[in-house]
């Protein structure tokens, strides 16, 4: 035999070869049987499973060993890796079932491996999925996977009640979606104890909104809408189209490559997205259908030479749209005007005018807006009641860098020194928040980010906080996710409770 270079990581030439073979491994699954001529030293060196088998067990002296495995072909590929062959897991196992079986086989051989990212599973394959999960483990990840893929017409009586309850709990949750510097999106629970990461090969843009009706995150990239479903955890991209709008309203309305779309706001009442369309000579507030993202109508149009559209906000009842314009007059002086557009009637009126720049604007509740400006090293928070056309008491403080609303009653004001929390004209301070951005969940969880450190705290106990130093957060949204199947699971559990009560 010619001299060969058999390194510890390259035994390709002797895989399934009787040369120096000291063990015959017979792999069996429900459909197939395969015999391999192998070498104990190679198996022992690369795999904890075989280390245990060949030391202290009766197989250590046997020339033939039979293993009942999940998938013979996958186990053969794993063993081939021990002999120096390239891992096939990335290129070969794209089918969801094969990826789960690969995970099961790795677990069988005591090989560390991450649970695979499963995106799309045909609902008709749910029983197959259930059988595989039963061989893996019932944990947060696998139960969520089952809940996502449970068919709406599935007979729940076939499942253990405890599993149905766990799927019900995992099919509805509160948390945060955030974006880092890389091209990825992360989903975290409210306490940031469990974080899942999804990576894509395109830039997802900067402007985004959450659509709770469909459990989707929408981000705008040029004249495209990037759409991430929190239920299927899959990604789609749509081009903003004007064909239907051209036929019905304006034949000349076009979207050019130089145009941009900014600041999307979701209107849950009408299932629409309100967005700013910036063109070369003017800006338009327009409306997109939230299913296919077609342009359906326009709300307002402004000439860029005279009016700069800066900010806009939608009331919680989705009937009042407030926007901020910087007006340039004939002598080039600038004034800022705030308008309200009543979407149910189409009426538009100016509600506020100032000679200062408005840096940001939010709705505190359905009638009161909060906005701020900075001048002469001071920050000025303003509040205004739209229904009463009345200015309300505000706050003068250090220069303001960010404002956020929590539970429709708290105003969180971030300055370059520290942070105020305002409620019912009373103030308190959070000293460890400064020069940052803040987002609040409906339950009162507060995340500060954009500074050297990220923090998690609560509106009810903001003196205590959790640092999120290991996370890179550029933008973040609170989400309340409810899968389509949640109500069915809830109704089923309630019906069993009623039957049990009637039988008592």
Curated annotation (Swiss-Prot):
The name this protein goes by in its record: Putative BTB/POZ domain-containing protein R842
Domain BTB: 21-91
Pfam family, one: BTB
Species the sequence originates in: Acanthamoeba polyphaga mimivirus
SUPFAM superfamilies attached to this UniProt entry: DPP6 N-terminal domain-like (SSF82171), POZ domain (SSF54695)
InterPro entries linked: BTB/POZ_dom, SKP1/BTB/POZ_sf
The organism's place on the tree of life at top rank: Viruses
Family note: Belongs to the mimivirus BTB/WD family.
């Amino acid at each position: 035999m010619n001299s060969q270079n058999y390194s510890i990581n390259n035994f390709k030439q002797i895989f399934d070869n009787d040369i120096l073979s000291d063990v015959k491994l017979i792999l069996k699954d429900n459909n197939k049987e395969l015999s391999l001529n192998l070498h104990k030293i190679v198996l022992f060196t690369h795999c904890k499973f075989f280390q245990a088998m060949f030391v202290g067990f009766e197989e250590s002296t046997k020339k033939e060993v039979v293993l009942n495995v999940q998938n013979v072909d996958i186990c053969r590929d794993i063993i081939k890796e021990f002999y120096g062959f390239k891992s096939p897991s990335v290129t070969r196992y794209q089918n969801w079932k094969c990826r789960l079986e690969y995970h099961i086989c790795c677990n069988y051989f005591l090989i560390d491996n991450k649970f695979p990212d499963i995106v799309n599973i045909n609902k008709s394959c749910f029983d197959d999925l259930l059988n595989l999960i039963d061989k893996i483990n019932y944990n947060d990840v696998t139960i969520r996977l089952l809940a996502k893929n449970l068919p709406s017409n599935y007979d729940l009586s076939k499942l253990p009640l405890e599993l149905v309850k766990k799927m019900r709990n995992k099919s509805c949750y509160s948390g945060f979606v955030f974006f880092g510097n890389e091209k990825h999106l992360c989903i975290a629970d409210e306490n940031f104890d469990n974080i899942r990461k999804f990576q894509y090969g395109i830039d997802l843009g900067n402007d985004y909104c959450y659509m709770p009706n469909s459990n989707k995150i929408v981000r705008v990239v040029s004249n495209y809408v990037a759409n991430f479903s929190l239920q299927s955890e899959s990604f789609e991209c749509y081009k903003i189209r004007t064909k239907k709008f051209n036929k019905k309203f304006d034949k000349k309305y076009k979207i050019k490559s130089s145009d941009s779309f900014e600041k999307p706001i979701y209107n849950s009442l009408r299932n629409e997205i309100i967005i700013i369309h910036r063109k070369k000579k003017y800006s338009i507030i327009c409306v997109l259908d939230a299913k296919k993202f077609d342009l359906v109508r326009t709300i307002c149009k402004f000439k860029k030479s005279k009016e700069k559209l800066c900010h806009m906000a939608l009331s919680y009842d989705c009937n009042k749209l407030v926007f901020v314009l910087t007006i340039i007059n004939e002598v080039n002086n600038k004034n800022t005007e705030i308008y309200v557009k009543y979407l149910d009637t189409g009426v538009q009126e100016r509600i506020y005018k100032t000679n200062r720049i408005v840096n940001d604007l939010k709705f505190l509740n359905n009638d009161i807006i909060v906005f701020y400006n900075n001048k002469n090293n001071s920050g000025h928070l303003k509040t205004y009641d739209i229904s009463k056309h009345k200015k309300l008491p505000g706050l003068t403080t250090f220069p303001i860098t960010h404002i956020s609303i929590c539970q429709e009653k708290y105003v969180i004001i971030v300055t370059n020194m520290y942070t105020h929390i305002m409620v019912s004209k009373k103030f308190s301070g959070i000293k460890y928040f400064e020069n940052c951005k803040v987002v609040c969940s409906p339950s009162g969880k507060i995340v500060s980010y954009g500074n050297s450190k990220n923090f998690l705290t609560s509106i009810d106990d903001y003196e205590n906080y959790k640092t999120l130093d290991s996370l890179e957060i550029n933008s973040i949204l609170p989400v309340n996710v409810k899968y389509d199947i949640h109500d069915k699971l809830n109704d089923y559990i309630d019906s069993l409770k009623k039957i049990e009560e009637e039988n008592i």
